Every structure is written in structure tokens, then in C-alpha cells.
């Protein structure tokens, strides 16, 4: 079992070498055909801003595009992510994709428990803990996604929900294994509503304290926490000013080269 950050070159090359580095991951969800992805990346990879050492840029295409996207970005600073995986490494699980398959084609990181996986496909915290372990076992950095629904927020249950998601989701995490968190309030995803930056900072600080209590102070300090939920260029700067926001998980705005670059440019000048 992989338990040491130094044991995997994927981990050391993806995670920040300095605390000032900032993540921006574009989640394409179930969008783009092969030809559309090729057109996007041929325009995108030539952009000079992607060489900014303070920004770690990643794309998260559908499974069908991972290999072809990797061929285009393999000699660039862009990192490759997957949208989910199965918790078992191989077997009779028709339609599923395993961590060894993803690792073999050059995937650097994988989303675990995106809100659409939780709420549309009914993925539960315990199974997500197993998925996180599968990623770690195969040298892929897991991005554990957490967040509350509108009903839970209005009931004042946000912290209780996040505490449960973190406690169970990280329960199988090996000592010293690296991971990333992504806070994505369900009520802000694809709705055009973005959480108030002060609220985002408060929640990210809460999550960091939970990691400190569950694992260690060192883990809390080195774990990047991203924000996701209707991220666009016009709200990026305010989010980057939050001290506990270490990056952004971008959805719809990552489907266009122009809008994705506009976000990256806002990060660069922040």
C-alpha cells in the first residue's frame, strides 16, 4: 500500500511545491466529442499563461477522451484528471473504470464524490472512502468533493454534513497519503449562484480544522482545498483572496477556451 508522498512521482509533480501555487481544474462532465476536445486543446495548449509556475491547471474530460487528451497535453504543464473510478482494481463490473486503467494512461488525479455522483447516482460516503483508497493505492491523487444541499444549508446543517462527509470519506486514508478537498455547495453548481466569499472562507477554514482533528496539523496545512460552484471570471478574484481557498473546480466555464482562460488570467493577476 502506498503511504508515503515520496513513493509516487505523480503525487510530487501534481501537488504544490510551494504554498503560493494555485489550482484550477476544469471539469468537462459529460461534454465534448473527440473532435471537439481536439479543437479545444489545440487552441488551449498554446496559451503562454499555462506556463505560469504559480498556477497548476488541470482538465477533467469524460473517460472516452482521456487517452487522446493525454497525447496532446503530455509535454505541457496541464494535468489530466478523471471524473470518478471504481473502488475495485479489476473484475466483473461492467461499465466501470478502475484506478490501474486510469494510471496506465497518465491520469494524475481523480474526483471522488462529485455532487452529481452523490445525488444522481446515489454514491455514499462509505463507498467513496473505498474509492479514495483505490486512488491512493494506485498513485493517483484523489480530490474528495464535499458539499451541502440548499435544504441542508437552510436548516443550518452545513457543518454537520461536511463533518460527516470528511470523517467517513477520509476514514481509510493511509498515513501521509496526499489528497485534495473540493468544497462545492450543491445549491451553487450550475445555478449561476456563487457562495459569498466570506462564507466560502469560513467553510474552508472549518474543513481545514476538521482535517487537523482527523489526521494532523501537517495534513491540514499541506492539503489544498478548492472551491467549486458557478465559478466564472467575474467572481474568481474575490475567491482567490480567501486565504483558505487554494484553487477552483470549474464546471461550465471550462468548456470554452475563452472563458476558462479568463478565469486563469484572473488568478494570475491576483
Swiss-Prot record:
Pfam families: TIM (PF00121). The active site is at residues 114, 184. Belongs to the triosephosphate isomerase family. It comes from the Bacteria. InterPro entries: Aldolase_TIM (IPR013785), TIM_sf (IPR035990), TrioseP_Isoase_bac/euk (IPR022896), Triosephosphate_isomerase (IPR000652), Triosephosphate_isomerase_AS (IPR020861). Involved in the gluconeogenesis. Catalyzes stereospecifically the conversion of dihydroxyacetone phosphate (DHAP) to D-glyceraldehyde-3-phosphate (G3P). The keyword Thylakoid does not apply. Keywords: Cytoplasm, Gluconeogenesis, Glycolysis, Isomerase. GO terms for cellular component: cytosol. It catalyses: D-glyceraldehyde 3-phosphate = dihydroxyacetone phosphate. Its EC number is 5.3.1.1. The lineage of its organism: Bacteria, Pseudomonadati, Chlamydiota, Chlamydiia, Chlamydiales. It comes from Chlamydia muridarum (strain MoPn / Nigg). This is Triosephosphate isomerase. The keyword Cytoplasm applies. One of its GO terms (biological process) is glycolytic process. Homodimer. Its main location: cytoplasm. GO terms for molecular function: triose-phosphate isomerase activity. It is an enzyme of class 5 (isomerase). CDD domains: TIM.
Amino acid at each position: 500500500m502506498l503511504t508515503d508522498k515520496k513513493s509516487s512521482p505523480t503525487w510530487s509533480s501534481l501537488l504544490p511545491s510551494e504554498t503560493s501555487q494555485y489550482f484550477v481544474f476544469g471539469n468537462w462532465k459529460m461534454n465534448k466529442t473527440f473532435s471537439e476536445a481536439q479543437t479545444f486543446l489545440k487552441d488551449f495548449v498554446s496559451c503562454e499563461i499555462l506556463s505560469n509556475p504559480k498556477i497548476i491547471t488541470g482538465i477533467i474530460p469524460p473517460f472516452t477522451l482521456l487517452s487522446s487528451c493525454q497525447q496532446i497535453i503530455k509535454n505541457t504543464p496541464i494535468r489530466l484528471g478523471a471524473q470518478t473510478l471504481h473502488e475495485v482494481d479489476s473484475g466483473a463490473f461492467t461499465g466501470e473504470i478502475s484506478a490501474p486503467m486510469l494510471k496506465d494512461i497518465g491520469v494524475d488525479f481523480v474526483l471522488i464524490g462529485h455532487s452529481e455522483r452523490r445525488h444522481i447516482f446515489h454514491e455514499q460516503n462509505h463507498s467513496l472512502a473505498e474509492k479514495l483508497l483505490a486512488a491512493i493505492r494506485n498513485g493517483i491523487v484523489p480530490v474528495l468533493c464535499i458539499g451541502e444541499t440548499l435544504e441542508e444549508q437552510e436548516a443550518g446543517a452545513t457543518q454537520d454534513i461536511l463533518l460527516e462527509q470528511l470523517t467517513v470519506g477520509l476514514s481509510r486514508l493511509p498515513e501521509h497519503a496526499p489528497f485534495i478537498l473540493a468544497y462545492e455547495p450543491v445549491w451553487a453548481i450550475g445555478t449561476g449562484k456563487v457562495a459569498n466569499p466570506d462564507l466560502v472562507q469560513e467553510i474552508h477554514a472549518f474543513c481545514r480544522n476538521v482535517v487537523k482533528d482527523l489526521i494532523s496539523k501537517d495534513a491540514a496545512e499541506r492539503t489544498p482545498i478548492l472551491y467549486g460552484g458557478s465559478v466564472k471570471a467575474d467572481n474568481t478574484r474575490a475567491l482567490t483572496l480567501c486565504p483558505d481557498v487554494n484553487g477552483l473546480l470549474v464546471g461550465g466555464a471550462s468548456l470554452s477556451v475563452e472563458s476558462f482562460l479568463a478565469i486563469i488570467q484572473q488568478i494570475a493577476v491576483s
